[in-house]
Regions:
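Glycine-rich segments within core transmembrane alpha-helices of 12-TM secondary carriers
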Residues: 143-171, 366-376
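Central cavity-lining transmembrane alpha-helices of secondary-active solute carriers
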Residues: 60-77, 280-292
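Extracytoplasmic gate region of multi-pass secondary transporters
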Residues: 40-44, 236-291
């Protein structure tokens, strides 16, 4: 594969034709970022046992990462438009070890909430790499390129697999529990040693990203704070696309935070099996569907395809509210996962077709997606706490997707 695909240059004009180095480096860094995001969800069932927290309490801890990602994604998207993905992604990777240091000292519920918030920056990495990759590829190839980049969603599965593997085979857990520490480093032992490993990897990736990637030879000078502000005011389309991203990509955020605790609480699945088997399969189905669906968005009308995806999601989400026997419930979850990933890729494909401020609009969409993850996890926690079951939570989710379907049909009619 060429180091950098040749781009057409003539004076001040420049047309992107691709940059594999940026694409693959961004994919690796994004995968790492999402594996960081998964740490809270992976630890939640263990914290429930070690500290005696309720299912509702650990769901709130798991919701902190997507909540902060929602707050920061819009800012990082705008920053990537203005100053480029290379410097913004490098700075993010340099910052991520700081909350990990905090996790090494956390020993109360409030402390876990606080450090869990800042781990959400790993999830916010998506918007930076998405913007960086998009500027290097022409519109007719952006669907495939961004779909491949979005395979980095698999980082959630990596985190789900790596954390319990390290706990159970290498590091151990917490003192005085059924999973005692196996290794120690000064005052730190067992599960807390996950964070120095992750922090060191973040610093290495920061060096690699800055060294290997590059910015386009001619940046889009037309993108300014004023132009970014005007795009939010120009029409309702950025806000509709943001909602649609919440109904697709947001589902990954919601389910990756919610499912480990849900499977243990609702179906009495052993926590290691829930985290290392059932949830990673769900994430792999979401991530695996994104490259192909991005390619489909290049070949066919992405808005029409999105309408069909959302229709399927509504039906499957309503079926999940029936709380079927475990094999059937997992079959429904795995089926809907494919439509989540497909729909998310289609929304990402649609954005550059309408807007040059890809980072700003995608940042708004990512904010909606991460907010969906946080809000729906909290909704499920509240529903469980008040009714003793999750049925109404799934119905609320089906209703939210149905609204997205109505909005997508409006966009289709206008286009």
């Amino acid at each position: 594969m060429e180091e950098i695909s040749k781009s057409k240059q003539d004076g001040n004009s420049w047309e992107p034709t691709g940059n594999p180095k940026v694409l693959w480096t961004a994919l690796i860094a994004f995968t790492y970022g999402f594996s960081v995001w998964a740490i809270n969800s992976s630890l939640a069932p263990y914290l429930k046992d070690w500290y005696g927290y309720s299912a509702s309490e650990v769901l709130i801890v798991a919701a902190m990462s997507p909540l902060f990602a929602a707050v920061t994604s819009l800012v990082l998207g705008i920053a990537s438009d203005l100053w480029g993905g290379r410097i913004i992604f490098t700075l993010l990777l340099l910052f991520l070890p700081l909350p990990m240091i905090g996790y090494m000292f956390a020993d109360s519920y409030v402390a876990f909430l606080c450090v869990g918030i800042f781990m959400g920056l790993g999830g916010a990495s998506f918007i930076i790499g998405n913007t960086h990759v998009a500027v290097w590829y022409p519109k007719e190839r952006q669907g495939a390129a961004l779909g491949l980049y979005a395979f980095g969603n698999v980082g959630v599965a990596v985190g789900m697999l790596l954390v319990p593997f390290l706990l159970n085979t290498v590091l151990g857990g917490a003192p005085g529990t059924d999973l005692p520490p196996k290794l120690s480093l000064g005052p730190f032992e067992g599960w807390r040693l996950i964070f120095p490993v992750y922090g060191l990897l973040s610093l290495i990736l920061a060096f690699v990203y800055w060294t290997v990637t590059s910015e386009p030879p001619i940046r889009n000078k037309k993108i300014t704070f004023a132009s970014i502000g005007s795009v939010y005011k120009s029409s309702t389309l950025p806000w509709i696309l943001a909602y649609l991203y919440g109904a697709t990509f947001g589902a990954l955020m919601f389910n990756s935070a919610f499912l480990p605790t849900y499977l243990v609480d609702q179906y009495d699945i052993e926590k290691q099996k829930a985290i290392m088997v059932f949830v990673p399969i769900f994430v792999l189905l979401v991530a695996g569907s994104r490259p192909f669906s991005g390619w489909l968005g290049d070949k066919y009308n992405p808005i029409i395809l999105l309408v069909y995806c959302l229709g399927a999601e509504v039906v499957l989400a309503a079926a999940l509210s029936m709380q079927l026997a475990f094999p059937w419930q997992m079959s429904l979850l795995y089926a809907i996962a494919i439509f989540y990933g497909t729909g998310a890729s289609l929304v990402v494909k649609i954005i550059p077709l309408y807007f040059k401020e890809v980072g700003a609009v995608t940042g708004l969409a990512k904010t909606a997606g991460a907010s969906t993850g946080a809000v729906m996890t909290i909704v499920m926690s509240a529903v469980k706490g008040t009714t003793g079951e999750y049925t109404y939570g799934w119905l609320i989710w089906a209703g939210a997707i149905a609204l997205g379907l109505i909005l997508a049909l409006r966009v289709q009619q206008r286009s």
